Amino acid sequence: MLNNKVLLVVNSVYQLFTAVHMKRSILAKKEADLLVTDITAVLHTYIPRLKETGLFAQVIFGKTKEWNQKYAAAKGDTLDEGFQNASHTLRWMLNEELADYSEVYFSNFDPFIRMLACQFDRPSCEFIWYEDGFSTYVIDYLREDRAPINRHPAGGKIREKVRRVLLYEPHLALRGDHLINQALPKVDRNDQELKLLLNYIFDYQKPEERMDFIFLEQSFRAEGIQTNDLALMRLCQQAVGPGRFLVKPHPRNPENVPFQLGLTRKYPTEAPWELFLFNENPEHCTTITVCSNAALTSRIVFGMDVNTVMLYRLFEGKVLWKEDAILKQYLRKFRRQFAGNNYYVPQTVYELQDILMYLGGRHEPTDQSFHHYSRVSGRKLS
């Protein structure tokens, strides 16, 4: 009998948002298990509500973070040790047993997923990569010279299992690998059933305070990357006024540094940004970021044209350690081919100030430090 059961693995709130959307669209006729990991701390809190929806046959919790950290950059004998006795390791990590699956959907090529590829090493089980922000569009994770784990017999096994990747905008892909890019259906903002389902899972509450200018933080501090993003936040706060400026913290950053520095009040929810776009009227707010793909999801996921200010021309530092040049191509391609009329990329801090004022920022003189902000160095993402 043909096995039609699938497994979806989620490591972040954005992945969970997309996994629920996939289950109600392209996977509607298939029985599915959901595996929620501890990569993002808040994810486990959604498990009771996920179970109550009955959307998935089984909701499994996996403690994969520590194991991933141990083996992500490992080599040789250490990797041999990690991939030995995969069945025992999986029983130790997961609170429920896995079933037999025809397809496994995942977003990250972490050691855990690579171990699953070894566990389900048979032609009848396909591994399918799905959207996880710009990294899915620009990084060839399986290139042999990218990481030692790709050259390991077990760690590289997943290369034989993956043939395609599901993206909201396949034509944006620039990875340079041989995977087939296929389209995920965009989310229909008029789909009330999906909206109610996601609101229940994430316990979404309508913001009580104004969210006129929202800065989407990125995971630079979690990855140890030195940048000027906090200085850029301060510039934006001065341009629009503290009461109208809010920073959405990145869930992987260990501390809410912008809040600690007084750059923002507390962000009101841990639900994915996409759920705010789904529920509210984002046409009346402005999204600001260095280059977070979340700022592009209004266009990529929903087909909307929301005020968006991208600060990557003012940014100091590297966003990606190895694929920064490809990321620049991705951002240029998005701007040329996909961006709407309300998409802005300021070249100078003075242009940034003018754009924010045009979009409704305050018109009184700003703090002097704005005008004396140092020029961006040659390391900027151009």
Residue spans for each PLM region:
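Active-site regions of enzymes building and remodeling cell-envelope glycoconjugates
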Residues: 48-62, 124-126, 144-148, 245, ...
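C-terminal structured domain segments
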Residues: 20-22, 31-49, 284-347
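Donor nucleotide-activated moiety binding/catalytic core segment of transferases
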Residues: 251-296, 300-301
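A nucleotide-sugar donor-handling region in carbohydrate enzymes
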Residues: 131-214
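Leloir-type glycosyltransferase catalytic cores
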Residues: 320-382
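Active-site and donor-binding regions of nucleotide-sugar-utilizing enzymes
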Residues: 7-153, 295
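Conserved catalytic-core segment of nucleotide-activated headgroup transferases in glycan assembly
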Residues: 199-202, 208-253
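Short loop/turn segments at strand-loop or loop-helix junctions that form parts
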Residues: 60-69, 108-110, 127-134, 210-221, ...
